[in-house]
Amino acid sequence: MAGITVAAVALPLALAFGVSSGTTAAAGLITAIVAGLIISSFSGAFYQISGPTGAMAAILISLIGKYGMNGIFIATFMAGIFLLLAGIFRLGNLISLIPSPVITGFTSGIAIIIASGQIKNFFGIEHFTGSFFDLMKFIGGLHIDYPSTIIGLLTILLMIFYPKSWGKKFPASLLAILLSTLAVLALKLNVPVVGKIPTTLIPQAHLRLTEINLQDMKTLLIPAISITVLGMTESLLCGASAGRATNHPMDNNQELVAQGIGNIFIPFFGGIPALSLIHI
């Protein structure tokens, strides 16, 4: 039953983080599946759940335009190697040295980046490539798709006011997806949709060994390090928090090994970087 509950929560999150990262909903879904199978098998704690996250989406959205999907795949592969080495050399214990205000500012910044990046989707504005500030400056003169905005607003309200006691049995995010999908179909609303989800676990867009070369690895070193640092930070902080709540401390270094193995393989399935997160 716990597995079904987690899957119900993870499905809408995987789709949402796939889109908000600048990739596709399919990439988010594939990441959740592969990460769930591989990372959980080697994890340092039974309560850790891995998949695409909001924090990683905030980084990827700035990388996808510059390096493309293949660049993301290679950076993820490199980050997986770095995470694996970090676990082997027992660097997981360094997480306790990070100041609390740094983490607070980090998570707040992620929330702002994700929210600002989804403004144009919220208003149903297509083909706008400017920055968030450009969008806010000219939004009055842009064509706003009101059905998209209304659906987005109702979804937010449902997520805010949905009773927490109900959420343990049926997640608000999953209910929002079901209701909005039914509304679009029943009313025949012309709004942008996620699109076709591949029926195969390995889509056409995925990393191939022949595409990995030294020059690309040099170019993508900094993005790979960024993914690695974020992977270490979020995964171990989530594990520390859940460990205190369950009185079962996590093996930090084993968790890094698991994250490393998972992110080495995920790009070959067409997925994006996976981290650990807490589902409550």
Name each model feature, range by range.
Residues 1-278:
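Transmembrane helical cores of multi-pass ion-transport proteins
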